[in-house]
Regions:
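N-terminal Rossmann-like NAD(P) cofactor-binding subdomain of oxidoreductases
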Residues: 1-155
Length: 155
């Protein structure tokens, strides 16, 4: 079953998530359905295509209105400051990658759950109230299906 992914915050970490999904050929497992960032689709497409660290993105990237199109996959670009107002239910988002650095507690990150997402992964150290702090390869076996807001420790 394909996991529908949304990214909130399209800085270094958000862009690396996109890069990882495409460069490891995992698009049959993970479908990126939305990016929420204050930058517009054209700017974010450019940042996807050209990276000073990783070089040029090896896939076709274009813009179609408020969508970034990567290899034919349409990714909706949003610019909403309040995560509770995002259309995660409409987009059937399974997991939000919270990459802004602003919503690092369970209380704040749960706004994505309120908006309709099933789970949230915080890309920064989480507050004491997160369900778990998971470092894959170190303690990933502690992750439970009932966890809704987790931190991946740090970017």
């Amino acid at each position: 079953m394909v996991q529908k992914i949304a990214i909130n915050g399209y800085g270094r970490i958000g862009r690396n998530i996109v890069r990882a999904v495409y460069e490891t050929n995992r698009t049959s497992e993970f479908k990126i359905v939305a990016i929420n960032d204050l930058g517009d689709a054209k700017t974010n497409a450019h940042l996807t295509k050209y990276d000073t660290v990783h070089g040029k993105f090896p896939f076709d990237v274009s813009v179609d209105g408020d969508y970034i199109v990567i290899n034919g996959d349409r990714i909706r670009v949003l610019a909403e400051r309040n995560p509770a107002n995002l259309p995660w239910k409409e987009l059937e988002v399974d997991v939000v990658h919270e990459c802004t650095g602003l919503f690092t507690t369970k209380e704040k990150a749960s706004a994505h759950i309120t908006a309709g997402a099933k789970k949230v992964i915080i890309s920064a150290p989480g507050g004491e109230d997160v369900d778990a702090t998971i470092v894959y390869g170190v303690n990933h076996e502690l992750l439970k299906a009932s966890d809704t807001v987790i931190s991946n420790a740090s970017c």
